[in-house]
Amino acid sequence: TDSVRDYFLAEVWINNKWDWPGKNWSMWKVQNTDSSNEYADGKWRFMFYDIEFGGVSGEGDAWTNTMKEDNYKPKGLLDTDTKNPAVLSFAYLMSNEDFRNDFNDRLLKMSEGTFEKEKALDRLAEFESIYSPLYEQFFARYPDTGSAEEALHGGYASSDCIRAFINKRDKSIQSIVDWTNSQF
């Protein structure tokens, strides 16, 4: 259950929507267990990939209730009638009060820990310093796809959009928790 919880916590906090959770989710496990490795116990675990939609729409998406508005169903990620096995697993776990309380507490705390604003902004600046020098080369190779200036300061998916999302997302998390609790 920890894998499900932690995976959905991150996906919800970053508001990775559009093509998740309908697709772009996967699970893994080892075939041969190894007692010296806590992740080599043979249990299935969710894994992240293709999360590029998280936070890229900027400030407006910071206010999205990802629990409610994902999965294209009236109850979003809490829909127990879905055919999506990832969402179905999560929805049933959320029907357990202890799991739900733990999930909600951890979601609120992510704004103070893993996704604390200054830490996330510092990480974004670190990525900008690594990748910005490559932008001119990239856009020269792929003309008519944008520019270095747009990648940093343009609209959708620019660094500025991600920065705006990071600056506001923590303020919306309580409303996500409140909505989630109102469903039970």
Ranges and model annotations:
Residues T1-G22, S26-F184:
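Middle-to-C-terminal accessory/interaction subdomains
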